[in-house]
A protein has these predicted regions:
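E2/UBC-UEV (E2-variant) core
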Residues: 114, 127-128
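Extreme N-terminal basic, low-complexity initiation segments
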Residues: 2-8
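Long, positively charged leader/targeting segments at protein N-termini
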Residues: 32-94, 98-105, 133-494
Length: 494
């Protein structure tokens, strides 16, 4: 459907969160005292209601920016609204998009060949930096210029702000490593651009260096929304005002709250689509309005938005299980993949929408793939169902090794209790291996978090966030490695 939101980011260094994550605190659930103190300090320099600056650019606006005791700054309904009512609407022409960046006077002269070689996310990042440096260039940029000023005055918090020592507090989790990889990729990309003279002129004229480029991508990580369009393309948008809404895990995950809509007036060209926020439920006047940034784990929220949610129901751990791709088992893998959330990934360097489970062939430069990676975003609420879909892959690989010349392997070949038990044991061993990379017990982390929360020191905010991530991930892994002799997976029927 036109305008369906993409709920996860590309698996590349240049596109990190795909849902808007506004500042400074973003969860409907109350945050720790230390985190709220730090957030209050970061927002002290902002205007009382930064939304007012954009009033003339909104098609409709029925919210106002307000401070809330439980969450910090958020968006309050100006009047009572019903579920589905419009809260905010802004034309795309006033938003940050790759199309707007290509029309930027500093970037347009580079020509289509060069601009086509720059990713949409990088185009938006460069546009933000250019406008931040020089202000508006014509009426089309005035709204974006105001937004760039606000972005420059706002502390952008992501895991890229954490020091190497602070990231070590996440040891065991992939989120301890991802920020360094991302920063390295961004800096390398910027360095490569510095060998292209026309871009160097743009950089020098607008004081753009590697640090600024990383900052702009942090803005995208925390504020960008992506929409899957009917033609198969993806539209990335940073919408002034839309990025001021807070996240709620109680808001429904879907495409009805933040969406692309045609203009309400027939006199307005259809090309001027609107970025719209609609109420996911009824709100009273003055009540904070939220939408869901998607079913993101605390690790992903911390990476892209600098916050976590205590007891986040969407917490997950990402498994990457490599299996040999023997000729006899290839059709069986493909058949089993149909039961996965995302099926079989075919071609391309990344998935535009990253499902919770999918099978991906490992590229082989010298010929056909010889291995596959089974990606599983293991969530606490669905552990049993997900592992039940994974065990048959291990069983299939066992059968293929035992009979490499077999040509009749099918789902009907699976389900023998003894084979299923061994396959479950192998899966549990993989999970245990991942669990062993985490230091300490779940109980020790819970006790440490409780002690830090009691102290309420702002200086411990990041330590508390790290513990929330580790607690969520350890709880999932500890649940997934119950003894095989009592594990229902070992005795599952075919």
């Amino acid at each position: 459907r036109e305008g369906v939101r993409v709920a996860a980011a590309r698996c590349s260094s240049s596109a990190f969160g795909a849902r808007a994550v506004p500042w400074p605190v973003r969860s409907e659930r109350p945050m720790s005292a230390s985190y709220l103190k730090a957030a209050a300090a970061r927002s002290a320099a902002l205007p009382d209601d930064p939304l007012k600056a954009f009033a003339s650019y909104f098609t409709e606006c029925h919210v106002m920016s307000t401070e809330f005791a439980a969450t910090g700054r958020g968006m309050a309904a100006q009047r009572a609204v019903a579920a589905g009512d419009l809260l905010l609407s802004i034309p795309l022409e006033h938003c940050w998009t790759a199309e707007a960046a290509r029309l930027c006077p500093e970037l347009a002269p580079l020509g289509d060949a060069v601009l086509d070689a720059i990713s949409p996310e990088n185009l938006i990042a460069l546009h933000i930096l250019i406008v931040r440096a020089r202000g508006a260039a014509g009426d089309g940029d005035r709204c974006r210029a105001l937004h760039a000023e606000l972005l420059a005055a706002t502390h952008v918090e992501t895991l890229l702000n954490w020091s190497e020592q602070e990231l070590e507090m996440l040891a065991g989790s992939k989120w301890a490593l991802a920020p360094s990889w991302m920063r390295q990729d961004l800096e390398q990309e910027f360095d490569e651009w510095c060998h292209y003279a026309p871009l160097v002129e743009v950089f020098n004229a607008h004081r753009i260096d590697a640090a600024a480029f990383v900052w702009a991508h942090q803005v995208l990580m925390s504020r960008m929304i992506s929409f899957a369009l009917a033609d198969g393309s993806t539209l990335h948008v940073v919408g002034p005002g839309v990025d001021m809404f807070n996240h709620s895990i109680d808001a429904p995950v879907g495409n009805e709250d933040v969406r692309l809509e045609p203009p309400a007036s027939a006199s307005v060209p259809d090309a001027e689509r609107q970025l719209v926020v609609r109420a996911s439920k009824a709100y009273a006047a003055g009540e904070q309005a939220f939408f869901s940034y998607s079913c993101a784990s605390n690790g992903r929220l911390l990476l892209s938005g600098g916050f976590v949610i205590p007891g986040n129901p969407w917490d997950s751990v990402e498994l990457a299980l490599t299996l040999p791709l023997l000729e006899s088992v290839t059709p069986l893998y493909a058949a089993l993949a149909q039961a996965l959330d995302g099926g079989l990934e075919s071609g391309g360097a990344f998935a535009e929408f990253v499902p919770s489970e999918f099978l991906q062939p490992v590229p082989n430069e010298s010929g056909p793939p010889t291995a596959v990676v089974l990606h599983v975003r293991l969530a606490y609420a669905t552990i049993a169902e997900q592992l039940a879909r994974v065990v048959p892959f291990f069983e299939a690989e066992m059968l293929a090794r035992a009979a490499p010349e077999a040509r009749d392997l099918s789902p009907d070949s699976l389900g023998q209790p003894a084979n299923r038990r061994v396959a479950a044991q192998r899966l549990v061993a993989c999970v245990l291996e991942l669990r062993s990379t985490y230091a300490g017990s779940l109980e020790a982390d819970e006790a440490a978090l409780k002690a830090l929360e009691a102290q309420g020191a702002p200086s411990s905010a990041r330590r508390q966030q790290a513990l929330q991530v580790l607690i969520g991930e350890k709880r999932i892994l500890d649940t997934a490695v119950v003894p095989v002799d009592v594990c229902p997976l070992a005795c599952m029927p075919a």
